[in-house]
């Protein structure tokens, strides 16, 4: 009994000498600082955006100036009684000035390629009682391939719009309207619309593979407020121009339609 009592006493003493571990208290680790959102740099303004009317030239550009247009230069291409047309260097588009208000369009026109001033026409083309500005641009002149584009600029109270009546846009609509028939036996291609037509006979060596036909040239003729587009039809394999497709441009204030379409031959079979 004494031995057991001594053992119990020793156990109690040991228990009393043992230190209690302090309770562990959870503390969150310091939060990593949130990175500040990257601030995008403000886009740089285009060199021409600060231009005002007094900064613009008043004299028409000469052919020499057209050929030497600088990257940050403005040239006056033409004017009517109320509108002036400018080209911006560095392929930056054009500016229109009307009643003290500038309108910018990013259309590509390189006077270095044509060395020709555009021609400006002021007329009420859509019949709304207000004049629009139509501009005929020479876009390409290489050998017998000459391409003009027409742009119609229309002003409302707040905005100015540009309707491009280009060679490609007119060609797409004309191709959808005309009929082309090829006879491999005789090697003849007939291009027709209504009761108008033109016929081209391919040389013998091309008859099995005549290739494509395209409208490769364009010109816009103006008379009494009506523009007529003249598209030159060419056989790609031989390079022969064999027909013109003509159509009047009807502008409705938003888009254009080809009216009075006809085919005229330019070669004799």
Per-segment meaning from a language model:
Residues 141-153, 238-246:
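Structural motif
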Residues 59-77, 117-125, 215-222:
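Beta-propeller blade termini
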Residues 94-111, 152-165, 251-256:
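Surface-exposed loop/turn elements that mediate protein-protein interactions on large endomembrane-trafficking
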Residues 159-242:
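Short aromatic loop motif centered on NTY/YTY
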Residues 1-5:
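Positively charged n-region of N-terminal signal peptides that target proteins for export
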Residues 20-100:
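N-terminal, intrinsically disordered, polar/charged segments of Gram-positive cell-envelope systems
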Residues 75, 127-137, 223-230:
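Acidic/hydrophobic-patterned starts of short beta strands in beta-sheet-rich repeat architectures
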Residues 14-16:
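C-terminal motif of bacterial Sec signal peptides marking the signal peptidase cleavage site
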């Amino acid at each position: 009994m004494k031995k057991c009592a001594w053992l119990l006493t020793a156990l109690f003493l040991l228990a009393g000498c043992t230190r209690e571990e302090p309770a562990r208290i959870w503390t969150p680790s310091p939060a990593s600082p949130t990175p500040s959102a990257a601030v995008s740099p403000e886009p740089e303004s285009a060199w021409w955006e600060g231009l005002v009317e007094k900064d613009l030239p008043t004299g028409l550009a000469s052919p020499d100036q057209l050929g030497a247009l600088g990257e940050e230069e403005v040239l006056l291409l033409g004017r009517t009684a109320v509108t002036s047309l400018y080209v911006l260097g560095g392929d930056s588009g054009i500016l229109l000035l009307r009643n003290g208000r500038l309108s910018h369009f990013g259309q590509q026109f390189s006077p270095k390629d044509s060395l020709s001033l555009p021609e400006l026409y002021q007329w009420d083309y859509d019949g709304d009682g207000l004049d629009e500005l139509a501009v005929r641009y020479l876009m390409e002149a290489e050998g017998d391939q000459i391409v003009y584009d027409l742009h119609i600029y229309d002003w409302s109270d707040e905005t100015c719009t540009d309707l491009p009546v280009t060679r490609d846009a007119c060609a797409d609509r004309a191709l959808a309207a005309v009929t082309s028939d090829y006879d491999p036996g005789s090697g003849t291609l007939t291009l027709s619309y209504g009761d108008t037509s033109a016929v081209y006979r391919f040389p013998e060596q091309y008859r099995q593979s005549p290739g494509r036909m395209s409208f490769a040239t364009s010109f816009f003729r103006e008379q009494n407020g009506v523009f007529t587009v003249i598209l030159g039809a060419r056989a790609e394999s031989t390079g022969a121009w064999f027909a013109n497709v003509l159509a009047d441009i009807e502008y409705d204030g938003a888009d254009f339609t080809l009216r009075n379409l006809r085919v005229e031959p330019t070669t004799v079979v």
